[in-house]
Amino acid sequence: MTQFPKTVMLLGSGELGKEVAISAQRIGCHVIACDRYADAPAMQVADQAEVLAMTDTDALLATVRRHRPDVVIPEIEALAVSALAELEQDGITVIPTARATAVTMNRDRIRDLAAGELALRSARFAYAASAEELRAEAPALGWPVVVKPVMSSSGKGQSVVDGPDGLDQAWDAAMAGARGTSPRVIVEEFLRFDLEITLLTIRQHNGETLFCAPIGHEQEHGDYQCSWQPAELSSEQLHQAQAMARTVTQNLGGVGLFGVEFFLCGDEVIFSELSPRPHDTGLVTLISQNLSEFELHLRAVLGLPIPSITTADAAASRVILAQNQMDAVSYTGVDTALQEPDTQLLLFGKPTARPGRRMGVALARGEHLAEARAKADRAAACVRVLQR
């Protein structure tokens, strides 16, 4: 029988980490939130906070060893991943595993695993370690192509390139948006897909794997803009997606929730990417499911039962973005937005803003997806981010 309180340390304290912290505290956990800047969203609700350079191996090891948490939950990609393996050797549980975190934070490693070792369907791709290599590799994939850093988040450094003349600019953008030290990009064929989906996949201590209803979403420059649940898939498409998600998450191992992304192209389901943690497109589950992705993650991590996952008939989310650079923020239009029935707002509490930064999300339910999406869109459009 699981005994509480458990001590949970979050490595990264953004909006997703904040919801994980809240879910952990609801079941009696002590939460320590870590990030590179003070007053990050999860720190605002945590029991303790630590500010440190998250990519500094020595600083990360010292911080975790000082607290000796029961579990360490990485919430961001920009981490000293080599420290996670050392922590596992110390007997500290890393979620889902140190290896899974290391593999999935690098597009080349997860693509080599999924498309190579596991033979999952993916877009055709190549790697390039210089602008010259990029110019050599891209034409064989056909135009347009998508160029991405092997390590980045929230779409940073991604470009769609229509022809050879745009490759040097795409290389420069990838290097500017990259995290880590690898001067390498992945270049992919551009898929003319019908839909992008996220399949939230939950691995439990008892060995069982559960799935949430698929979530449809739209991206702009590689960054999530809106999502809806349930996405409409045929039974065969759902079977393909679940089989691929089960295969790749079983290989990665560990427990917890994974966000597995796919493209739907006609009848084909094509693997895209994977996050070993709650997914931004899954914010919709705060209104769509009886157990949100954050609650599911905590239950799986701590070995607690998940009797059932139920989903509303139609629910949607729409992000709220900042338009300007601000060193302190306030909001208007909240009262207007909440006049929409069956609608909620989630303002993340980020202390500063910059153009395009995600500051919140509107969530809505409806009788059908078109209604839910329209409600979320209207509510999000009401909210303005202002200098305080």
From Swiss-Prot:
InterPro entries the UniProt entry points to: ATP-grasp (IPR011761), ATP-grasp_carboxylate-amine (IPR003135), ATP_grasp_subdomain_1 (IPR013815), PreATP-grasp_dom_sf (IPR016185), PurT (IPR005862), PurT/PurK_preATP-grasp (IPR054350), PurT_C (IPR048740), Rudment_hybrid_motif (IPR011054)
UniProt pathway: Purine metabolism; IMP biosynthesis via de novo pathway; N(2)-formyl-N(1)-(5-phospho-D-ribosyl)glycinamide from N(1)-(5-phospho-D-ribosyl)glycinamide (formate route): step 1/1
GO MF assignments: ATP binding; magnesium ion binding; phosphoribosylglycinamide formyltransferase 2 activity; phosphoribosylglycinamide formyltransferase activity
Swiss-Prot/TrEMBL catalytic activity: N(1)-(5-phospho-beta-D-ribosyl)glycinamide + formate + ATP = N(2)-formyl-N(1)-(5-phospho-beta-D-ribosyl)glycinamide + ADP + phosphate + H(+)
Name assigned to this protein: Formate-dependent phosphoribosylglycinamide formyltransferase
Gene Ontology biological-process annotations: 'de novo' IMP biosynthetic process
GO cellular component, one term: cytosol
Family matches, as SUPFAM superfamilies: Glutathione synthetase ATP-binding domain-like, PreATP-grasp domain, Rudiment single hybrid motif
Protein's job: Involved in the de novo purine biosynthesis. Catalyzes the transfer of formate to 5-phospho-ribosyl-glycinamide (GAR), producing 5-phospho-ribosyl-N-formylglycinamide (FGAR). Formate is provided by PurU via hydrolysis of 10-formyl-tetrahydrofolate.
Binding site for ATP: R107, K148, S153, S154, G155, K156, G157, Q158, E188, E189, F190, L191, E196
Leading EC class: ligase
Catalytic activity, EC: 6.3.1.21
Description of how the protein assembles with itself and partners: Homodimer.
KW Isomerase (keyword) present: no
PROSITE patterns reported in the protein's UniProt record: ATP_GRASP
Superkingdom classification of source: Bacteria
Binding site for N(1)-(5-phospho-beta-D-ribosyl)glycinamide: E15, L16, E75, D280, K350, R357, R358
Coiled-coil stretches: none
Keywords noted in UniProt: ATP-binding, Ligase, Magnesium, Metal-binding, Nucleotide-binding, Purine biosynthesis
Annotated family: Belongs to the PurK/PurT family.
Sequence ranges assigned to domain ATP-grasp in this UniProt record: 112-302
Originating species: Parasynechococcus marenigrum (strain WH8102)
Binding, Mg(2+): E261, E273
